[in-house]
Amino acid sequence: MTPRRHGELVVTGVVGRDVDMAAAREAAGLAADNAVTALVEAVGLAGIDRVVKMTVFIAAVEGFTAHSAVADGASAVLRERLGARGAVARSAVGVRTLPSGAPVEVELVAAVTQPS
């Protein structure tokens, strides 16, 4: 998921050039919130057993090294929305570009119980 509200990216660009750290962390949080919302829509909140892994992709300038600090914004949202079920193994990966010029993208792998 990317940092969108009502289908529109709220920020675009490259972290360290167009997007500062505060905006990047906020964008990561919004992307994580969107990912959790998609899970809830699919299986309901009670259907989420736990998030197994989160990967945060960050479009950043060459030489950028604060990937984990950006990903902290996403981790905070998982803890806020899911509590202990959101305590997760995490990777933060720097990339050259992301879809539609997004500065971050969050991918979740979750263990779920299908609704009956």
Predicted regions and their residues:
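Short, polar/acidic, helix-capping and beta-turn segments at strand->helix junctions
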Residues: 1-116
